[in-house]
Amino acid sequence: MNKKILLVIFIVTMLIVDEVNSFEFGSFIKRMWRSKLAKKLRAKGKELLRDYANRVLSPEEEAAAPAPVPAKRRR
């Protein structure tokens, strides 16, 4: 390999090492938590949890509703 290629590889490696060393996991998690997708997922999760809690707390409403009886077919 010639010296120019080795120099480029060295510089790129140093840039990558600098990025990895400056990476903070806490800021990454904070950025993910504030993202639009995370907000949508949290809202959907809260809605599902609320629905589940309502079903668990008031199961008599579901039991009071009679199940539809299938009509017998005539031949």
Curated annotation (Swiss-Prot):
Subcellular location as annotated: Secreted
Keyword flag Secreted: yes
Swiss-Prot/TrEMBL keywords: Antimicrobial, Cleavage on pair of basic residues, Secreted, Signal
Main location: secreted
Stretch forming the signal peptide: 1-22
Domain of life from the UniProt record: Eukaryota
GO CC, alphabetical: extracellular region
Entry remark concerning the domains of this protein: Amphipathic and cationic peptide with an alpha-helical structure.
Function summary: Antimicrobial peptide.
Protein family: Belongs to the non-disulfide-bridged peptide (NDBP) superfamily. Long chain multifunctional peptide (group 2) family.
Name of protein: Antimicrobial peptide Meucin-49-1
The species this protein was found in: Mesobuthus eupeus (Lesser Asian scorpion)
Classification of source organism: Eukaryota, Metazoa, Ecdysozoa, Arthropoda, Chelicerata
